Amino acid sequence: MNYVLELKNKRFIQADKKNKGGGITMNSKVDVTVTHLDTLIKQLSSIQEFWQREHKLFTGLLVSVHYNKIAAKSNRISGLFKGIHSNDAVVGAKFNDDKSKHIITYFLEDKDLTNSIELLFQVRVILNEVYTGRMSKNILENAEKVNSNIFKNYPISMSVFKSVIADVSYIESFQVHQPKLIKSQSIVTLYDVKKDIKELLEEIGLDPLHVTILDDQTIYLTDTQVQVLFENAAYLVAMATVDVSQLPPDEFIDTYESYRITIPEPTIEPTIGVIDTLFDERVYFSEWVEYHDMVSNDIEKSSLDYNHGTAVSSIIVDGPRLNPWLDDGCGRFRVRHFGVAVGKSFSSYTIIKNIKKIIANNNDIKVWNISLGSSYEINDNFISVEAATLDRIQFEEDVIFVVAGTNKSSEDVIKIGAPADSINSVVVNAVTKEGLSTAYTRRGPVLSFFAKPDVSYYGGSKDAYIQVCEPNGVQSVAGTSYASPWIARKLSYLIDILGLQKEVAKALLIDSARGWEENLDPNVLAIYGHGIVPIHINDIIQTKEDEIKFLVSDISEKWNTYNYGSLSNVGVFTLRVFFGTNHMYGWCHSFCSKVEYVL
């Protein structure tokens, strides 16, 4: 076996950008016609009249552009609205119902709308008089048919004409977004209209002192406050989610094995943070757990509220002894356990508030396990508030969350639930002992293109349950809740014991799961993530005799944008050496491309 190598003290050097970008590109599948221009002019005029009639609570206006495809950044508006700076005015983006088209919301000044209507009129005149009312991509790119001489007698230049034509070729319609009313307490995200949220709430008719503000655009409202918001300014709502979440059910065998287990006292072992339901301090490993009850004393607690949280912490502390077939070679870990929920229902707002406080006050812990999740599916168009909060915390506090992929509450539930849509977290789905997807597993992706879950691990099934310690003894259970703690153990070993950066540790973990699989089927990726993480830590930090794996990391201070692929500041390179040749075949996970090295 070969150990993984980490290469240091060599900065990344940014290559010069060879491709300076293309010019104006029209949609090749659409001809722009006078009829379509007339429709868009009418729609923008109606929107202008709407905002003139409306008692606006802010300076400016909101317009949602329905594109006729999934619009790349280069295909979005660059002639209308604010011209080449229009992307800076984007305040919201989502998909249509069948996820085949983009709907992008812009925050504009009144003059932007007036100028856009005038531009469309001027383009219409030229299109009708010079090009018989129709423009195709072939004609637009023909210098003999579209040149500056033609525009000498018109108020707009050739470049403006081509920009607007290109814009219109990707636009289906203009609208003002009006969401459906949610009749319950909710977490609501408002569009950024460049106004202080407290002033905005007062204009809406809500007392800021009686509204819980989560951040600059997100608020927690009671059902009555939601009603007031939707009556007075529904167009401000970018996203609204019901606050009460339900914990998806776990599978378990309703029998306990009650026998005495002993465990040595903790010494210098690393500490993993656990945010879960309550913890029972009477269990055999309680000396390894520092427990903090965050649930209000006004909330009634039952004995069942201690089962889930205690079980999760038992895996982190002593999982390999309870499950010898899952001995990962990582040893034992201490736990700082924060009980933030009881029963099967909990408030998302309360969880968010507690997590912010917990992480801020416990910055000595780098790895955190969250096995709580919603029984509801994630929104196709938005990252959940819970996930967005985790993403922000991980960036600001230099920590990493391991999040359970959530279980099915019924056969109708297919997609993962919040906060398993967290982009920065390591999201873990469960597999059986044979490495197959379980009956309770839910699937990604997130926003149609973010690969979630990240990885899979053994979470138990009817063929082989996971053994945990609950208050009444050893219990046989199954669920994604019991897969994620094993990954938290491995990450803590890589970060707290080996001293790797969290980004490098995450990349190494994904690399170990992915193996030499170059192109994963999207359906496989949506269920298993990049693959099943090896059981033993040595299979992550070591490679086979014919492989060399090395890590490189740095901060990417500049970047180039490509149509396909992505760049990051971490690379995990695996080289397979073929003896007797002068080539090494290389594969870079999970943030780079395949490479071949010549000796």
Say what each PLM segment does:
Residues 2-264:
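Autoinhibitory propeptides
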Residues 23-49, 54-55, 70-81, 159-163, ...:
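Subtilisin-like peptidase catalytic core
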Residues 261-293, 299-348, 396-398, 422-424, ...:
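Subtilisin-like serine protease catalytic core
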Residues 276-278, 284, 415-492:
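Extracellular S/T/G-rich loop segment that most often corresponds to the catalytic His/Ser-adjacent loop
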Residues 341-418, 476-478, 482-483:
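Substrate-binding/access-modulating region of protease and related hydrolase catalytic domains
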Residues 498-570:
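C-terminal subdomain of the subtilisin-like protease fold in secreted/lumenal serine endopeptidases
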Residues 569-588:
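A short beta-strand element within beta-rich, extracytoplasmic domains
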Residues 585-597:
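Short coil-to-beta strand junction motifs in C2/discoidin
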